Amino acid sequence: MAEHIILECTECGDRSYLSEKNKRKHPERLALKKYCPVERKVTLHRETK
């Protein structure tokens, strides 16, 4: 079953994105490059606890 996760910018700490993931299939923490509106550039966003 998919659970909701929050993606946080690693540079400024802004939490701009919500996503879903299946934690049984992918137990590791997700990290994606996304656009950060605060920094106004593409930065690495990681899954929060």
From Swiss-Prot:
GO cellular component, alphabetical, reads: cytoplasm; ribonucleoprotein complex; ribosome
Sample GO molecular function, one term: structural constituent of ribosome
Coiled-coil annotation reads none
Q: Which Gene3D superfamilies match?
A: Ribosomal protein L33
Example GO biological process? translation
Q: Which domain of life is it from?
A: Bacteria
Keywords, ordered alphabetically = Ribonucleoprotein, Ribosomal protein
* Pfam families with a match to the protein in the record: Ribosomal_L33
By sequence similarity, the record places it as follows:
Belongs to the bacterial ribosomal protein bL33 family.
Under what name is this protein listed?
A: Large ribosomal subunit protein bL33B
Q: Which organism is it from?
A: Lactobacillus gasseri (strain ATCC 33323 / DSM 20243 / BCRC 14619 / CIP 102991 / JCM 1131 / KCTC 3163 / NCIMB 11718 / NCTC 13722 / AM63)
Q: Which gene encodes it?
A: rpmG2
